[in-house]
Amino acid sequence: MQKIMLIINPTSGGEKTLDYKEKLENKAKKYFEQVDTRITQKAQDATNFATEASRENYDAVLVFGGDGTVNEVISGIAERDYIPKLAIIPGGTGNLITKLLEINQDIDGAIDELDFSSTNKIDIGKSNGHYFGYIFSIGSLPEAIHNVGIEDKTKFGMHSLCG
């Protein structure tokens, strides 16, 4: 394969994703001639980076972040004419998508197990113009989860989402 874009959310999970940047890049270099890394800084960055990867015909996108980051990436490629392969490393608080896909929840283990030679198709959903890869909910629960700050997620992990 020719090129891959790594999309890393540095505020996901325990804010430790950047600690694995070099290891991810080295793993990707075993499979790809060109490895480009993008670091998100604000909402919609992952969507914009994924759209760029699709527009520029990247062979694959690897997202390292939580469910929100993965959903942003899915939104960035879902309606494009060309859709690159998608790999996910669990770096968030809940990592529900990677759990459903039975991806190793240990970051080092997930990186070690990355295999770009095989793919699986997954279903995605869309509501009000927003794509999602795992769960759709309405009402006070998603609002409460959305309002949990990065600091609380870092400090309390999944317990911060208990409301």
Per-segment meaning from a language model:
Residues 43, 68, 113:
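Positions that flank functional sites
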